[in-house]
Amino acid sequence: MELNTIKPASGAKHAKRRVGRGIGSGLGKTAGRGHKGQKSRAGGYHKVGFEGGQMPLQRRLPKRGFKSLTLKYNAEVTLADLQVLAADEVDVPTLKQAGLVGERAKVVKVIKSGELSKKVVLKGIGATAGAKAAIEAAGGSVA
């Protein structure tokens, strides 16, 4: 086999459909568009979601919720994440280097999920009441 001899399998390629080229082709005159109406005209078609004048689905359904603009800057870390983290002093840059929070995170909070048995000192990071109690019970502190 050589590159200049490769061909598609027979029947795999179809000739382009030529419309409006006489009645013998089966697609002459109206070219498969039917008779009259908006869809038969040049440049004539409805917008996406148009339901013939009926109130469209995207307007019939109620709006719900909103997209928080601060969400991308806020992050949370669990006690289990702190347990596997090698550092004893934890701040936002440390968490970013470890890949526990995103690069754009500005505010980080520790939540009580999982167990913590080692001493951890938090600097510039908030903690929920339960997480703070667990950190202090393990000998750590929240600054």
From Swiss-Prot:
GO molecular function: rRNA binding; structural constituent of ribosome
Keyword Secreted tagged: no
Gene Ontology biological-process annotations: translation
SUPFAM superfamilies, alphabetized: Ribosomal proteins L15p and L18e
Compositionally biased tracts (Gly residues): 21-31
InterPro entries tied to this protein: Ribosomal_uL15 (IPR030878), Ribosomal_uL15/eL18 (IPR021131), Ribosomal_uL15/eL18_sf (IPR036227), Ribosomal_uL15_bac-type (IPR005749)
Keywords, comma-separated and alphabetical: Ribonucleoprotein, Ribosomal protein, RNA-binding, rRNA-binding
Gene3D superfamilies, per database record: 3.100.10.10
Region entry Disordered, spans: 1-51
GO CC, alphabetical: cytosolic large ribosomal subunit
Assembly: Part of the 50S ribosomal subunit.
Entry's family note: Belongs to the universal ribosomal protein uL15 family.
Functional note: Binds to the 23S rRNA.
Protein name listed in UniProt: Large ribosomal subunit protein uL15
Originating organism: Methylibium petroleiphilum (strain ATCC BAA-1232 / LMG 22953 / PM1)
Gene name of the encoded protein: rplO
